[in-house]
């Protein structure tokens, strides 16, 4: 076990995007959207948008330790949510859209998810489960608006 720090900052998930935005701000982040379109951004923009999301979640009353889920594909929006949620100190709970409904209900309730970020094509999955989800306060759909 190493007793000394190898770097002058405490490593955590949010520090990864901070580092990337600082050292490689213009490096491209490319993702394919659900629509099939290719979206291009960069680490600096992902970091800025992740910070905005973190601030909004705190403003809405969510705090460190809360569990916030995502039901999404690997797009730039999911990446921003991942860094934004972890950046404000909440737990990111990634959900698998392939789960049987009973499994999904159990997992969401057991994790005590308070918010679920969801990709538009997966909204019907959550609509079917909604009345059985006891801890979810809010659903946020990833979209362009």
Locations of regions flagged by a protein language model:
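Generic alpha-helical structural signal
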Residues: 14, 18, 47, 51-54, ...
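Conserved AMP-binding/adenylate-forming core of the ANL superfamily
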Residues: 29-75, 79-83, 100-105
């Amino acid at each position: 076990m190493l007793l000394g720090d190898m770097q002058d900052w405490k490593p955590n998930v949010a520090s990864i995007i901070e580092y990337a935005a600082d050292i490689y701000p213009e490096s491209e982040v490319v993702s394919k959207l659900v629509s099939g379109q290719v979206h291009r951004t960069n680490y600096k923009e992902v970091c800025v948008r992740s910070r905005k999301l973190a601030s909004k979640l705190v403003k809405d009353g969510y705090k460190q330790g809360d569990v916030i889920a995502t039901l999404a594909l690997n797009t730039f929006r999911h990446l921003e949510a991942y860094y934004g949620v972890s950046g404000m100190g909440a737990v990111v709970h990634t959900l698998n859209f392939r789960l049987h409904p009973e499994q999904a209900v159990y997992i969401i309730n057991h994790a005590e998810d308070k918010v679920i970020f969801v990709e538009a094509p997966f909204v019907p999955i959550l609509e079917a489960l909604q009345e059985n989800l006891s801890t979810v306060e809010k659903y946020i759909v990833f979209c362009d608006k």
